[in-house]
């Protein structure tokens, strides 16, 4: 493969809902670029893009796969991104390295929730889009409905460049109002006839052409003047105006195609090459806020957007050349570690195929192998240049489960395997919770986690069990209570003795501090000698006040008392959960000149706290999440009813671009496998986000149940 200059490169990500036909479209693009002589199909499990075994088993894209074709003297790099919300991380990483997107819409389904989600991501990353209405050869293809939904969702941006002739099983061509031609296809291999527009379609073509001209003129004052002067624009002028509109995010040009029959694919590629953005037009923002122009004259830098482990190659780092000219054997500096990395081999990538190349210009996408620290989000740059690019920010997790090896002997092996998988897929989060004493695996949905399980068992040979994780409850109090506890132990020689009297009260936001209380029926003012305040790592506060007078307890034992309190804060008296938002006053006690020591006061403080806590109106608190659901309106009732059964507090409903949006506060305990539940309720048509909000007291019946479960567990462990 020859080296292409930056201006002759186009980087395009294919995005859209699952089953919109992106992989089939990518296969047709490779066929048009003569990369392959015969197109594969998802059903036959022989596409270039879906080359991983798990993708063949599921017959869907799971990973974002880089591909390329050499077409019209241009390097046409394509990343086929997964359409399922569960695998959104692959699409997000592709947004970082592509200047253009093709939004693929299934003509049978029209604009789906997933369509809107991907369009929003593209808008967030300022990624210009071209729209490809695919599967126009399908029995239920509905062009008019799809266009109407696009206008409802995207407002004034959609503009028709092509419209189909005979949509449905007999679909064999379209009218292109930019070219003012009728493109007729004689077979399923993209063989095209360029014909005059039939008389019965000319009025529609001329109307749409005029709309296209007016839209193109909107984005350039000079073109607007020409339009007013001449009443029309040339094909090149229309393309120029559309190009500016695409760059400004103000227009969505709509194309017709059937990826399966290779109808319209070549024309889509032609338009993309002539109109879309080349890397030479772009600048990339570094961590320190500077901009680096994507050209060969700047210091060489690459950004790693994806990592993988592949048979016979080991660890593979996929990158974009952000600036400069990358050559085989070049030494670059790792922006994270400062270490030098040598790129002993570089490759152009088309699915599983890696073609070794001697160099890649700025703007190119490629891969290398066996870097020491070539992880996702790492910048490698010319020695001394100091270039480090902003990280990809991946979406928050929406699914969590606990995981353990089937055999305890495999726990170490499991940990190593999970570490490798999470390095390859940053949307897989693995953490060991000291609080829950469980390994928690988080991802985008149950399908995402199931793929992780498949990889663990088939690629790493570790059989695993996945199950509902424990909930990180919190414990607190609602009123004042006191307790005195004496720890005394005699066993010959020096014994143990420590007595502590404490008062505890809740810390409530907005309620001022007080040191006036009623103890044993008497009004008492506790004089504070010293105080310590702690922001707890699990949330909330602990305030510790030494109010002991008359030398009842030496100051040297106060740290031991505080340690005893902290011990019980990390293992609350009700369910063993972390305690929070408690103010503790140590106001009296006793000590022994010989037997008192640190351990005595640690134990006395722990037991005094436990006793006082149980008398202070103790409450269990649960984590609450803000949940936002986007769904077709037909499913709103089912979604709301389901949430109400999950103890949710509905906060609002609204309409957004043709979809219904439901906002609610939901206990985490009710959200296990919610992505699966929502998919079942809506036939996979809805999506949701969840974000931690705060902690709230559980209802009385839930607290009773949790206390009983904890008591049974304690008894079982005795």
Regions found by a protein language model. Name each.
Residues 1-718:
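Structural and coupling elements of P-loop NTPases
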